[in-house]
Amino acid sequence: MKKRKNIIAAVILLMCCVAASLKAEVRYATTSVTDIPFDMPRVALPDIPANTVCITDFGAVGDGGSLCTEAFAKAMQTLAAKGGGRLVVPAGIWLTGPIQFENCTELHLERGALLLFTSDFDAYPNVSTVYEGNTANKKMAPLWAYRKHDIAITGDGAVDAQGERWRPSKQGKFTANQWKELTSGQGIAHKGVWYPDAKQDDEAGKEGKPDFRRVLQRPVLLEFAECQRVLLQDVTLSNSPAWNTHPLKCEDVTIDHVTIRNPWYAQNGDGLDLESCNRCIIKNSTFDVGDDAICIKSGKDKEGRSWKMPCQNVIIEGCTVLHGHGGFVIGSEMSSGARNIYVYNCLFNGTDTGLRMKSTRGRGGVVEKIYVDKINMVNIAGEAFTFSLYYANKPVAGKQDGDTSSADAVPPVTEETPCFRDLHISNITCQGARRAVYFNGLPEMPLSDVVLENSLFVCDEGADMHYAKNITFKNVKIQQKRGERITMADVKNFKEK
């Protein structure tokens, strides 16, 4: 009897060990970065079961005209009933409404597959989400997940969200011929802005009033909110109604060899907005967009501060940015803060600005421990490195491009005061920019503790700094065409070595 009990105990122990070993087989994302300047935790990859279904099994037709929304919903529900798995989309044009992910599911787009999301406004239910840092009532994102775990989009296929059927377009972004061509088709021009649709449900529609619902409620292309273990790999995500890709309050996010595209004129056409996420690797991806390309965010103002969720533990490596308002950007919605961010070995080619950090009074939040290394920049329209705490607000008098009006009173430091400190920028090579460096902090909260080293800037103008302290330049070469190499006002403890 005693021997039998021992055998049973041994079997139970063995089963526990096997279960523990299976549970421990977590796969992690890899990075080529070896000297990460902070304690970076590993980033877990999704665990997708081996079950596989094909979208054609559910009646979908890839002819670009047959609506496949119901087929995608049935496929996801079928996988969910099996505990998860992979949904394969073969070559073809698959017209569909929004796709909602279930736990442990992977959407795999084979080469030649195009997900074409319908422009039917009513195909997208309204959802409570976050946009520009605050709670908002918007249309559901075409690619949508809320509080799911282990989800992925993979494959060499592409996604087109038909953003031109949602976005307004400002006349100032177009040449005369481009504007004429845009406004000659469907849509309506109203006060220097082209809108994709006129309002049809009242008399105002007959007078050419735009349908502002479509504009105000337009969704981002991809929103994964409060999800764990997310993977985007190899796919092309393009033509979003608003922002392109928006992981929100997620953990363990990997974006690898992804192409993110929006038209250069796309209103609010950001590429990647990583908001209040933890443990992320963004690598070997390409961005060509209409607004900021790779952007770190963490909520806006009082609501954002209440999250207490900084965007943190992020590696961005081996990425290329073409058109975009900024190559790597922090802000302006950063009220929960950001820290432990490492940007390494990237190329910015033809971007409006290279490194862009922005906020304003009222935001609050602390941004610190930001590391940027080995960035090559070519043909930058504005600044190679710009920092301003006057985003969308008037700067202190005389501190930006000739403003000579009287200065406002300096407010006290409160939780609403944004703080940027402990920035380390190294090995920057910029061949062509309007200005090398522009710093504009707040009188009550200067930009502080910045090290810029081993860098070369070939530009029209040099460095211009205001309201900053503890700034160190080490082996920084600035070859400007005009003006002084460095100009400063209200800068304390500047050192050059």
Language-model regions, residue ranges each:
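Bacterial Sec-dependent N-terminal signal peptides
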Residues: M1-R27
